[in-house]
């Protein structure tokens, strides 16, 4: 640091008194210049630090290890594109999720004579999504039934997705699909969309928990295609999302005591057969034989000692809707008998959810176990 020269009392004053102020002025200028240079150096260090951080984030970028579709290689400099890792498609949980969603769509659209076989190939143009939403929402959309050109397809898809987003009422950052991604047959976007629809409309299906998909992010840098992989979560805890997250004794049995679970199942089978045998009916599989609601309705009549008129329910239901109506009717009979409203949804029983079925039957057992 520059300092001013000390004055000696025995030395006469300098004949050039302006020199010291000039030196001070120079020192001041150098100080300011030094400060400016220091600030610039600090700013450069910050910039380098930020760049280092960005490089750390992008460190996983590496040459692509699998063959890309020719369309996916047509990228502009620094353009980014995402796609599903081909190896990830074989994941059993992902395969299960896609099958559950395909079966659900086909069941909803059975009256439309539409059969979906591949989610990306069959949903990208908006036709199936239109019919699915119209059926779920009971609302006719003002869109063209058939579209051939890409422009017409995207216009239709835009209208359909706007209606879906309005119904779901999701915050913008939670919407993980758009016209371009769906029309580009982006499986991740389509899965996010279908999962959101199934949960909002409380579809009678059980989605597998914690399904993730390996996504490859491709970017063009200095003329070279590079990629990195990320895990994209499609479903989390589906029970918590559907409001069925309160754990009870059956959660514990399923998770930690499968041997005791079998004892409970045998006890309940003995209980229901004790009464259903009076009608020459017998149960061997709890989750499947109560799924259409018929045995539940008949069982309630036997336990309460009355005859349920056959016109009050569907004796041979042939659709999900009729099965749900049967189970809902049985739930009403249970409440009429003094039981609380069952915690499971009728759709859970129809979907052969064993845990839900056991909860309902166990409530009946605790109230009616001494009934002959």
Swiss-Prot record:
BP terms from Gene Ontology: actin cytoskeleton organization; actin-mediated cell contraction; cell adhesion; cilium assembly; establishment or maintenance of cell polarity; establishment or maintenance of cell polarity regulating cell shape; heterotypic cell-cell adhesion; outflow tract septum morphogenesis
UniProt-annotated stretches for the region Interaction with ARHGAP31: 21-25
Phosphoserine found at: 8, 14, 19, 28, 62
Sequence ranges assigned to domain Calponin-homology (CH) in this UniProt record: 95-202, 262-369
Keywords for this protein: Acetylation, Actin-binding, Angiogenesis, Cell adhesion, Cell junction, Cell membrane, Cell shape, Chemotaxis, Cilium biogenesis/degradation, Cytoplasm, Cytoskeleton, Membrane, Phosphoprotein, Repeat
Chain positions covered by the region annotation Disordered: 1-44
Region Required for interaction with TESK1 and ILK, annotated ranges: 223-372
Compartmental location: Cell junction, Focal adhesion; Cell membrane; Cytoplasm, Cytoskeleton; Cytoplasm, Myofibril, Sarcomere, Z line
Keyword Cell division set for record: no
Membrane topology type: Peripheral membrane protein
Domain of life: Eukaryota
Gene Ontology CC: one annotated term: plasma membrane
Biased composition (Low complexity): 1-11
Residue numbers of N-acetylalanine PTMs: 2
Pfam families the UniProt entry points to: CH
MF terms (GO), sorted A to Z: actin binding; protein domain specific binding; protein kinase inhibitor activity; protein-containing complex binding
Organs and tissues of expression: Widely expressed.
Protein's UniProt keywords contain Cell membrane: yes
Signal peptide positions on this chain: none
Record note on quaternary structure: Component of the heterotrimeric IPP (ILK-PINCH-PARVIN) complex composed of ILK, LIMS1/PINCH and PARVA; the complex binds to F-actin via the C-terminal tail of LIMS1 and the N-terminal region of PARVA, promoting F-actin filament bundling. Interacts with TGFB1I1. Interacts with ARHGAP31. Interacts with the actin cytoskeleton. Interacts (via C-terminus) with TESK1 (via C-terminus); the interaction inhibits TESK1 kinase activity. Interacts with PXN/PAXILLIN (via LD motif 4).
Biological role: Plays a role in sarcomere organization and in smooth muscle cell contraction. Required for normal development of the embryonic cardiovascular system, and for normal septation of the heart outflow tract. Plays a role in sprouting angiogenesis and is required for normal adhesion of vascular smooth muscle cells to endothelial cells during blood vessel development. Plays a role in the reorganization of the actin cytoskeleton, formation of lamellipodia and ciliogenesis. Plays a role in the establishment of cell polarity, cell adhesion, cell spreading, and directed cell migration.
Protein name as annotated: Alpha-parvin
Encoding gene per record: Parva
